[in-house]
Amino acid sequence: MNVPSSAERWRSAMLYAWVSAGSVVGGLTRYLVGLALDTGPGFPFATLFINATGSLIIGFYATLTGPDGRMLARPEHRQFVMTGFCGGYTTFSAFSLETFRLFHGGMKYIALAYVASSVVCWLVSVWLGHIMASRYNRLKRS
């Protein structure tokens, strides 16, 4: 049986704390952005925007701090941003509920447009984040 040392347990606890803190910040940010962009019934622009910007952030940060990235980030900082913040900020569950409500409310074409535009927007956002960070990574360091 391999028992983790107290240092390993401390590192694990700190990583959990970083992810938790990122989740809190991401969740609060999502709530505030959702309030600011709430357009009422119909097409859920706030959730589309939140998931698109979250995809942009994770694509940018993953590339910026990846093996070929310009920025060296500690594992706990990557987990804070990518797992914690982006996980707390983006919301597939809200997307699912909004899509269900649109279908259930008889707005089938709006629901289909929402699903299609969301998937395209998220993928384009991750790609744009990656491209932006890749270009930044190639800049001369000062």
Curated annotation (Swiss-Prot):
Na(+) is not transported, but it plays an essential structural role and its presence is essential for fluoride channel function. One of its GO terms (molecular function) is fluoride channel activity. The gene is fluC1. This is Fluoride-specific ion channel FluC 1. It comes from Bradyrhizobium diazoefficiens (strain JCM 10833 / BCRC 13528 / IAM 13628 / NBRC 14792 / USDA 110). HAMAP family: FluC. InterPro entries: FluC. Pfam families: CRCB. GO terms for cellular component: plasma membrane. It is a multi-pass membrane protein. It is found in: Cell inner membrane. The chain crosses the membrane at residues 17-37, 42-62, 80-100, 109-129. Belongs to the fluoride channel Fluc/FEX (TC 1.A.43) family. Na(+) binds at G87, T90. GO terms for biological process: cellular detoxification of fluoride; fluoride transmembrane transport. Signal peptide: none annotated. PANTHER family: FLUORIDE EXPORT PROTEIN 1-RELATED. Keywords: Cell inner membrane, Cell membrane, Ion channel, Ion transport, Membrane, Metal-binding, Sodium, Transmembrane, Transmembrane helix, Transport. Fluoride-specific ion channel. Important for reducing fluoride concentration in the cell, thus reducing its toxicity. It catalyses: fluoride(in) = fluoride(out). Its main location: membrane.
